[in-house]
Regions:
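A short alpha-helical cap/connector motif
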Residues: 1-113, 120-141, 145-202
């Protein structure tokens, strides 16, 4: 099965089973960013079924490129293993199962790209745990940061979304205003932020 076959199967599975994966409108930007930064060591929070990991894998350094990806949900973790093991990139992707807020406290590696795509209300807390492991000049991508148009603009979020929206606003305030980040927000899909980490001493 080719990589395109696997990705197509994942898109169908995600649609049928209501699994959130990158939207078609975001995929081109996502691939462009990975291709631009050419990371060798990637940390992903929110594997889902491994779709974004398989988009990234061919764009990494052929010799040293590696992805570590964390997922809490048992079924999604198993589906990610199923799809990734069918690909040519199984040796480049390490899947960890567990609550990211706990797993992140046990990190020992260093990463030059981080992709936040797990629980939206946890982005800032997770970023604070991850930053000691981000190389200077590393990049943090965060998906869904505009969350249905509620985070920026005049739309009032329904009560059930108020906490998520508030926490995403706090995340964006942090990465846009701290001097050690250079942040750009792209409006494609549900919004993606790209923050370049200038280092701990900047």
């Amino acid at each position: 099965m080719t990589l395109n076959d696997i990705l197509n199967e994942q898109r169908i599975y995600a649609m049928i089973n209501d699994v959130p994966i990158l939207r078609e409108s975001e995929v081109h930007l996502f691939e462009e960013l990975i291709g631009l930064y050419r990371p060798t060591s990637v940390l992903e929070v929110g594997t889902a079924i491994g779709y974004s990991a398989l988009l990234m894998a061919p764009l990494l350094d052929k010799e040293e490129g590696h992805i570590t990806s964390i997922e809490l949900d048992d079924v999604r973790h198993e589906m990610a293993k199923y799809y990734i093991n069918q690909s040519d990139y199984a040796d480049k992707i390490t899947l960890l199962k567990g609550d990211a807020s706990q797993v992140l406290t046990e990190l020992t590696g260093e990463y030059d790209l981080v992709f936040l795509d797990g629980p939206k209300g946890q982005y800032l807390k997770q970023l604070e745990l991850i930053l000691p492991h981000v190389k200077e000049g590393g990049v943090i991508l965060a998906d869904n940061v505009l969350f249905r148009g509620y985070v920026r603009g005049d739309k009032e979020p329904p009560k059930r979304f108020k906490t998520i929206v508030k926490r995403l606003q706090e995340y964006l305030t942090y990465v846009e205003n701290k001097e050690f980040f250079n942040t750009t927000i792209y409006p494609m899909g549900d919004g993606m932020s790209v923050s370049v980490w200038k280092g701990h001493n900047k």
